[in-house]
Amino acid sequence: MGGDLTVKMLGGQEILVPLRDSMTVSELKQFIAQKINVPAFQQRLAHLDSREVLQEGVPLVLQGLRAGSTVLLVVQNCISILVRNDKGRSSPYEVQLKQTVAELKQQVCQKERVQADQFWLSFEGRPMDDEHPLEEYGLMKGCTVFMNLRLRGG
């Protein structure tokens, strides 16, 4: 395809992204993350003309984007929390209260190098369900979520 896609931020700054036919929203977000140091999970992208939010996993060209198109980037605000692992070590995580427990678990998986099915999270003594948003648990800036390993055996 060739050509560039323009990503425009609310502050007016713009970045140019080399566009490929097969490029997906996830790949675009990774490119943006490298350029402006905003994690992919904090990014919301919309087609500037239609104002439609771009769909994950769908090639950009199938969403009406081509060389010369402009995408609007909105950065979602985050809070910083701690996750304490089974060894008692706490690590900081940047999260949005709208994201699900499963999304936080994916962040933990990457940092702790453990599979999602090998642990569960709890906050203030309550187990956290994967499908529920973090806001349901009353998380606040600086709070600690606990990582609990699943027991093996029978």
From Swiss-Prot:
Pfam families: ubiquitin. It is found in: Cytoplasm; Secreted. One of its GO terms (cellular component) is cytoplasm. PANTHER family: FI07626P-RELATED, UBIQUILIN. The record marks R150 as: Interacts with activating enzyme. Ubiquitin-like protein which plays a key role in the innate immune response to viral infection either via its conjugation to a target protein (ISGylation) or via its action as a free or unconjugated protein. ISGylation involves a cascade of enzymatic reactions involving E1, E2, and E3 enzymes which catalyze the conjugation of ISG15 to a lysine residue in the target protein. Exhibits antiviral activity towards both DNA and RNA viruses. Residues 150-154 are annotated as: Involved in the ligation of specific target proteins. Expressed in endometrium and uterine flushings of pregnant cow. Also secreted. Not detected in spleen, liver, corpus luteum or muscle. GO terms for biological process: defense response to bacterium; defense response to virus; integrin-mediated signaling pathway; ISG15-protein conjugation; modification-dependent protein catabolic process; negative regulation of protein ubiquitination; negative regulation of type I interferon-mediated signaling pathway; negative regulation of viral genome replication. Transmembrane segments: none annotated. A motif (LRLRGG) lies at residues 149-154. There is a cross-link at G154 (Glycyl lysine isopeptide (Gly-Lys) (interchain with K-? in acceptor proteins)). Residues 2-78, 79-154 form the Ubiquitin-like domain. Induction: By type I interferons. InterPro entries: Ubiquilin, Ubiquitin-like_dom, Ubiquitin-like_domsf, Ubiquitin_dom. S-nitrosylation decreases its dimerization, thereby increasing the availability as well as the solubility of monomeric ISG15 for its conjugation to cellular proteins. Homodimer; disulfide-linked. Interacts with, and is conjugated to its targets by the UBE1L (E1 enzyme) and UBE2E2 (E2 enzyme). Interacts with NEDD4. Interacts with PARP12; this interaction inhibits PINK1/Parkin-dependent mitophagy. This is Ubiquitin-like protein ISG15. It comes from the Eukaryota. Gene3D superfamilies: Phosphatidylinositol 3-kinase Catalytic Subunit, Chain A, domain 1. Keywords: Antiviral defense, Cytoplasm, Disulfide bond, Isopeptide bond, Repeat, S-nitrosylation, Secreted, Ubl conjugation pathway. Disulfide bonds: none annotated. Its main location: cytoplasm. Both the Ubiquitin-like 1 and Ubiquitin-like 2 domains are required for its efficient conjugation to cellular proteins. The two domains play different roles in the ISGylation pathway: Ubiquitin-like 2 domain is necessary for the first two steps allowing the linking of ISG15 to the E1 and E2 enzymes while Ubiquitin-like 1 domain is essential for the final, E3-mediated transfer of ISG15, from the E2 to the Lys of the target protein. GO terms for molecular function: integrin binding; protein tag activity; ubiquitin protein ligase binding. The keyword Transferase does not apply. It comes from Bos taurus (Bovine).
